[in-house]
From Swiss-Prot:
This protein is involved in the repair of mismatches in DNA. It is required for dam-dependent methyl-directed DNA mismatch repair. May act as a 'molecular matchmaker', a protein that promotes the formation of a stable complex between two or more DNA-binding proteins in an ATP-dependent manner without itself being part of a final effector complex. The keyword Isomerase does not apply. Pfam families: DNA_mis_repair, HATPase_c_3, MutL_C. It comes from Rippkaea orientalis (strain PCC 8801 / RF-1) (Cyanothece sp. (strain PCC 8801)). Belongs to the DNA mismatch repair MutL/HexB family. This is DNA mismatch repair protein MutL. GO terms for cellular component: mismatch repair complex. InterPro entries: DNA_mismatch_repair_CS, DNA_mismatch_repair_MutL, DNA_mismatch_S5_2-like, HATPase_C_sf, MutL/Mlh/PMS, MutL/Mlh/Pms-like, MutL_C, MutL_C_dimsub. One of its GO terms (biological process) is mismatch repair.
Length: 561
């Protein structure tokens, strides 16, 4: 006979709950870091001693009074919410009041803290119930130091079941890097067994942070754009919601996995497959095949738009008006991918230019003017590009106010045509149909799928009565239609039509024709790469040309005096 149903003892309830909140070393770091950021910290020092199951987090936040220290580790004790309605007004990273109590349940907990207004700090040790065990005054700078020792000492099975130390440290690193992106103004130091392991300097935007996290990515490989947006459901909202996008320019950096497609909401990285998919779609046909973008989206939204109370670690949320935010993210990414004064100015720092200059730099030493040739980000419109020559009937040489550009004519035109086809996939009827032979059923279905009018004309013969307008006057239109029939979606067909219809390399162009192409290309949505992901242009800024021709040499030395 089974045992009768009865309530669990309180200590068992607390231990079960603590095991759900604190399940690893990374979870300890997560909870303490979020508390520190909620306290306004701008500098965090995290010390890890994983072999001895000890973690310490020190911050320069507002600190706690002695009265708060006595209550902070009690169950469900928090200063962040006070009533039911507050659950829909959450502006902090933490709100449940579970973290410190859970730590007291599964580890030895000690907290030292001092408010700026107090002349002395206090250090308290806690019982597993969260009640203070010992308290004493201590000399400490304003802020808080939380020390967690003997982690999972009361749960030996949990210790044995945890991943290897290296795996746990990787989880800590991933969390810190994510938080650094969401809070770029914060200085981060992580020590492992008293050796500096991770150091992240602060910045104004994630554009300064991301190069510290991703090897091979530089500041000028990235673009940062932001925009205030009025929430669709908040008619009385005074402050605009904010969308910030930090993206890798597709001709300069991309990944073989989508591991750097990240979404942050109100200071925390979250899993949001719909928004992540919107990011991938926005980058479609800008990257090489099987490559993925570097893109970090951070949404700062009205609390009423979000329900955080979905996952213990708050990595999953309910987001109201999801379709609206997907659309806004797509629009802002599109804006970031366009040519702008910022990208024109940063093109001089392109790694491809650096490689061209490297050989010259190795053979001679010369003084380089350290001026930073930045363009006013508030400039209206784009810098004019003036066509000056054609190189080998393939590259357009264009001049602008700060240097020289080389643009490959075929893929620049391909980008123009592709976006035109995206906006207006125009099919026109033919006076005389094109007859195709020996098509499979799949090929016939494919042509019909992309909108072409096709019908049987005889045995193994098919008549195509409508074709894309760009192909209608081409002599190789039948071959192009066979190519389109091979497979792929409408987007693939549009790329194929654009590629076949674009100006071929080796075709002479007049200055007016080149200028017309430049004017069309620089206003496209994704001018950096062709639809196959190849870079379209190379920028040689005046500063780079000066370096190559050694215009900064000291005159006497350059003449051997």
């Amino acid at each position: 006979m089974s045992s009768p149903i009865q309530p669990l003892p309180l200590n068992v309830i607390n231990l079960i709950a603590a095991g759900e909140v604190i399940d690893s070393i990374a979870a300890v770091v997560r909870e303490l870091v979020e508390n520190a950021l909620d306290a306004g910290a701008t500098r965090l020092v995290i010390s890890l001693f994983p072999e001895s199951w000890r973690v310490q987090v020190a911050d320069n936040g507002t600190g706690m009074t002695l009265a708060d220290l006595r209550h902070c580790a009690l169950p469900h004790s928090t200063s962040k919410i006070h009533q039911l309605d507050d659950l829909w007004k959450i502006t902090t990273l933490g709100f449940r009041g579970e973290a410190l109590h859970s730590l007291a349940q599964v580890a030895d907990l000690e907290i030292a803290s001092r408010c700026t207004s107090d002349g002395v700090g206090w250090c308290l040790r806690y019982q597993s119930s969260g009640e203070p065990l010992r308290e004493e005054p201590t000399a400490i700078a304003p802020g808080t130091i939380v020390t967690v020792g003997n982690l999972f000492g009361k749960m030996p099975v949990r210790r044995q079941g945890l991943p290897a130390i290296s795996t746990q440290l990787k989880a800590v690193q991933s969390f810190i890097e994510n938080m650094a992106l969401c809070h770029p103004q914060v200085t981060w130091q992580v020590w492992h067994n008293q050796r500096l392991w991770l150091n992240i300097s602060p910045g104004k935007t994630p554009q300064q942070i991301l190069p510290q996290l991703l090897k091979g990515v530089h500041y000028h490989d990235l673009q940062f754009v932001s925009q205030g947006v009025k929430s669709p459901q908040e008619s009385t909202q005074k402050d605009l919601d904010l969308i910030e996008v930090t993206l890798g320019l597709p001709d300069r950096c991309h990944r073989h996995r989508p591991d750097w497609v990240k979404v942050g909401i109100n200071g925390r990285i979250v899993r949001s497959p719909p928004v992540e998919q919107a990011i991938l779609v926005a980058f479609s046909r800008t990257l090489p095949k099987d490559r993925f973008p570097v893109c970090f989206i951070h949404l700062t939204l009205c609390p009423s738009q979000i329900d955080w109370n979905r996952h213990p670690a708050k990595v999953e949320i309910y987001l109201h008006s999801l379709d609206f935010w997907q659309e806004q993210v797509s629009k802002l990414i599109e804006q970031g991918l366009r040519l702008s004064p910022q990208t024109l100015a940063s093109a001089a720092q392109n790694q491809r230019v650096g490689k061209l200059l490297k050989a010259s730099e190795e053979k001679a030493s010369y003084r380089v003017d350290a001026k930073d040739h930045q363009t006013d980000a508030n400039a209206v419109g784009l810098m004019p590009l003036k066509a000056v020559a054609q190189v080998r009937n393939t590259y357009i040489m264009a001049e602008h106010s700060t240097g020289l550009w080389l643009i490959e004519q075929h893929i620049a035109h391909e980008r123009v045509l592709y976006e035109t086809l995206q906006d207006n996939w125009q099919l026109i009827p033919l006076e005389t149909p094109i007859i195709l032979t020996k098509l499979s059923d799949n090929q016939v279905e494919q042509l019909a799928r992309i909108g072409l009018e096709i019908e049987v004309f005889g045995e193994q013969l098919w008549a195509v009565r409508t074709v894309p307008k760009l192909l209608s006057t081409r002599e190789d239109c039948p071959e192009a239609l066979v190519e389109l029939s091979i497979g792929g979606d409408l987007q693939t067909a549009q790329v194929a039509v654009a590629c076949r219809s674009a100006i071929r390399n080796g075709t002479p162009m007049t200055l007016s024709q080149m200028q017309e192409l430049l004017d069309q290309w620089k206003t496209t949505r994704n001018p950096a790469t062709c639809p196959h992901g190849r870079p379209i242009y190379l920028s040689l800024e005046e500063s780079s040309l000066s370096r190559f021709f050694r215009r900064h040499w000291v005159i006497g030395k350059s003449h051997g005096i």
